[in-house]
Regions:
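Conserved PLP-anchoring active-site segment centered on the Schiff-base-forming lysine
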Residues: 1-19
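Short, intrinsically disordered, charge-balanced linker/junction segments flanking boundaries
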Residues: 1-3, 49-50, 194-208
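Short beta->alpha connector loops at strand-helix junctions that form conserved
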Residues: 10, 29-34
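A short helix-loop-beta submotif of the ANL/AMP-binding
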Residues: 21-27
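Active-site phosphate-binding strand-loop segment of PLP-dependent enzymes
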Residues: 34-107
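Conserved core segment of the aminotransferase class I/II
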Residues: 117-189, 193-204
Length: 208
């Protein structure tokens, strides 16, 4: 619907705006909480309206690298459950997780769907297996989600319409043999540490 709103959190992957606005909906952006890049819940709650249909979140985040904590996700889920009751309709979380494995120093990346039933999980192998541009991944639609049949049908329909992003059959076969194998992120971690230390040495302040 023209008045539908999707909320996301700054900083965010720029194409989110294209995805949302191409449907005629509006992207609403919660300003960044720069001291730790967790969610500014006061700002978030001010932006929620009866037109809010979904929240797009990305953890580990592109471009900040921040990982939303379990406490952050629990609070987000609690607020959205209250708003679902108040507004009388589902508010989905679209959890975009292409960087799930790329977390360092023992950081745990919580599974959002563990805390909130109305969660769609979008995963891509482009980062974990270094396959950018190959358009191979999946969307998890839990049985518990509101309007399951309608949501599942809409996603399946989108895959048929957007033929330029359909998963190539060759990569589907290849990934079936690779799924579940650990990703070697040592090079990413080393490069990240070098960049971080370089910025600190140059006088910058960085959140880590």
């Amino acid at each position: 619907e023209p008045q539908d709103e999707f909320i996301t959190f700054a900083p965010f992957f720029p194409e989110y705006r294209c995805f949302v606005e191409s449907t005629g909906a509006k992207l609403v952006v919660v300003p960044a909480q720069t001291e730790d890049f967790q969610i500014d819940f006061a700002a978030f709650e001010e932006l929620l309206t009866p037109h809010t249909k979904a929240v797009i979140m990305n953890s580990p985040n592109n471009p900040s690298g921040a990982v939303y904590s379990e406490a952050t996700i629990r609070k987000l889920a609690e607020i959205l459950r209250e708003k679902e009751k108040e507004y009388g309709h589902a508010i989905f979380i679209i959890s975009d997780e292409p960087y799930r494995e790329i977390a360092y120093e023992g950081y745990e990346v919580p599974y959002v769907s563990k805390y909130y039933d109305d969660t769609l999980v979008c995963y891509s192998y482009s980062k974990s297996f270094s396959l950018p541009g190959e358009r191979i991944g999946y969307i998890v639609v839990p049985d518990e989600i509101a309007d399951f049949e309608r949501v599942y049908g809409a996603i399946a329909g989108a895959g048929r319409v957007l033929t330029h992003v359909n998963a190539p059959s060759l990569w589907q076969l290849a990934l079936a043999r690779c799924a579940g194998r650990p990703s070697d992120i040592a090079a990413y971690e080393k490069n990240g540490q070098l960049l971080y230390q370089g910025l600190i040495d140059a006088g910058f302040t960085c959140v880590k």
